[in-house]
Amino acid sequence: VGGVDPAGIVRDVGMGVADISAGDRVALLSRVPCLSCEHCDAGNFKKCPNSVMLGVGRWGGAAELVKVPASVAVKLPRNLEFPEAAAVLRHGPMAHHLLFDIGGLKAGETVLVMGAAGGLGLTGIQIAKAAGAKVIAAAGSDERVAVGCEYGADFGVNYVKQELTEVVRTYTGGRGVDLVFENISNPKTWPKALKCLRKFGTLVTAGAHGGGKVELDCAFLYHQNIRIFGSTGSTDQNVSDTVALASEGKLKAKIEKIFPLSEIPAAHRMMEGEVLSGKIVLDPTAG
């Protein structure tokens, strides 16, 4: 059974579960720990080297019921609806981790968000803006740039039509950006994004769907004292901060369409056949 990032109401809990109760409204984190390694024994579930993705490595949430360890359940405030919660927790914790824990982004700094209309990109834009940063949204079409700006970016650039590095450096007065939030790894755009950085700037990345293998100008890297970090993780604090931002209305998901569970084939056809900027949600209560 597939289905990542479920959210719903707890039906029952096992013996020894203290923090979650039947009737609680929760969303589920996507990585399920093994519960038997040294990290899990110490309660550091997010460091589990054997974790699997819900709906990929074990049965997921495209069903009326799903059984998971209590460690992946996140309590939700009453004002956060299930579709919204499921979508924001998909990318919010990782974006928060990349921007602040790794990227060190501060209020007043400038961040370039690549793939700005995708799930991680739109999330990064909103979280950075909520922290007081200036955001440049970069995407591969005017329509997708517009989506990034709609969700809070201060400026947009179409990296297919425009020369990315030149436009960004002009916008920043020749200085460059403090942080590049990269989640594409396209061999055509990645080197240009890197050269948008100011001296002592940082590039963070968590994506490779654009190819994965890119060219690196090592002379630029060391002359400009650039830092490059990749990460797939997050912390419990990142999760809490994501829920808080969503509850306050500062982080919103772009939901393309909600399908009843009975129409899951149509949902998959939509996902496979269109270039989407929003999420597709399945609702088991709708039929």
Where are these regions (language model features)?
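Rossmann-fold dehydrogenase core element
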Residues: 201-206, 215-255
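NAD(P)H dinucleotide-binding glycine-rich loop of Rossmann-like/cofactor-binding domains
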Residues: 32-115, 150
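Mid-domain Rossmann-like dinucleotide-binding core that forms the NAD(H)/NADP(H) cofactor-binding site
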Residues: 81-162, 166
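Glycine-rich cofactor phosphate-binding loops and adjacent beta1-alpha1 units
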Residues: 136, 146-227
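C-terminal hydrophobic helical "lid"/dimerization subdomain
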Residues: 191-194, 236-287
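Hydrophobic beta-strand signal
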Residues: 27-28, 112, 204
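Glycine-rich beta-strand-centered segment in the early N-terminal region that forms part
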Residues: 1-41, 57-60, 77-79
